[in-house]
Regions:
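Membrane-interfacial helix-loop segments of redox and metal-homeostasis proteins
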Residues: 1-173
Length: 174
């Protein structure tokens, strides 16, 4: 049985994809403001948010709490449970990108490179938020297929395509 600390610092499984997409929308907004207004310190805000979500899911992240407790309950959408481990992996990738941007800004004074990294993060978060395409989840599935991530990490998500709705069969003459 998990200790209270282990339970607190665990990632939910499953997660509500609607909350994940709204949270990604918040990342898009923060990233766009950072780029458009040239506010490099927002890369640290993004990194802190990703770190909190990697450590404890939405429990500590102000952005995820806003999404899960304020925004999503007011939307006319049903919860959509999806596997948690790929989403956590995607949060880890977001952490890597946001930390890389912060380091490029503040440790290496490489603004252009930092804004390119932030732009890539905004692009990936836009795909998740607008289209429901989680690049980190696809990478997770690929790493599972290659055997880098063992199947027991997420037995239900080894093949993310198996969980997609199948198109309705075409009936001739209809």
């Amino acid at each position: 049985m998990a200790s209270p600390e282990q339970a607190f610092f665990s990632y939910p499984n499953p997660v509500n994809e609607v909350v994940a997409r709204v949270t990604a929308g918040g990342v898009v907004l923060i990233g766009l403001v950072a780029i458009a207004a040239q506010l490099p310190w927002l890369s640290i805000v993004l990194a802190a948010g990703f770190l909190l979500r990697v450590l404890a899911g939405p429990r500590l992240s102000p952005l995820a709490l806003l999404a899960s407790r304020v925004i999503v309950p007011r939307l006319p959408l049903k919860p959509k449970p999806v596997a948690g481990p790929p989403k956590r992996f995607a949060q880890l990738i977001g952490l890597v990108f946001s930390v890389a941007a912060a380091l490029l800004f503040f440790a290496f004074d490489a603004e252009t490179a930092a804004y390119v990294v932030l732009g890539a993060l905004v692009f990936a978060a836009t795909l998740e938020s607008v289209f429901g395409v989680c690049l980190g989840c696809h990478a997770f599935a690929g790493l599972m297929r290659l055997g880098v991530i063992p199947p027991e990490v997420c037995e239900s998500c080894n093949d993310i395509w198996a969980h997609r709705p199948k198109p309705a069969p075409v009936v001739p003459g209809s």
